[in-house]
């Protein structure tokens, strides 16, 4: 079974912990770049894009997959509905946000992967 990484964060940049957790869920991680959604896109355009991405993933990888789904909210929601209708499990990555504030006021934010959580 494949874990389809439908995000803007390639698995090659994941922490070792995130890769290990993904490989506990599936045999292989496949990166699938989350498409860009322009702010002026209409609901109809987002729906058409969701149909296209959904069809491409199911045609290429089948329905026996887990989808790691993170990205622009309206497209995520549209995709989630399509995947769930076909009983395809989707997960989100859960992170802990760590902020380091420097003396000059600059903030450095780091996100530490903790787990995958199933969309329900």
Language model segments and positions:
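N-terminal glycine-rich "phosphate-gripper" loop used for MgATP/nucleotide binding
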Residues: 66-74
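Long, low-complexity, Lys/Arg-enriched
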Residues: 1-65, 78-81, 85-120
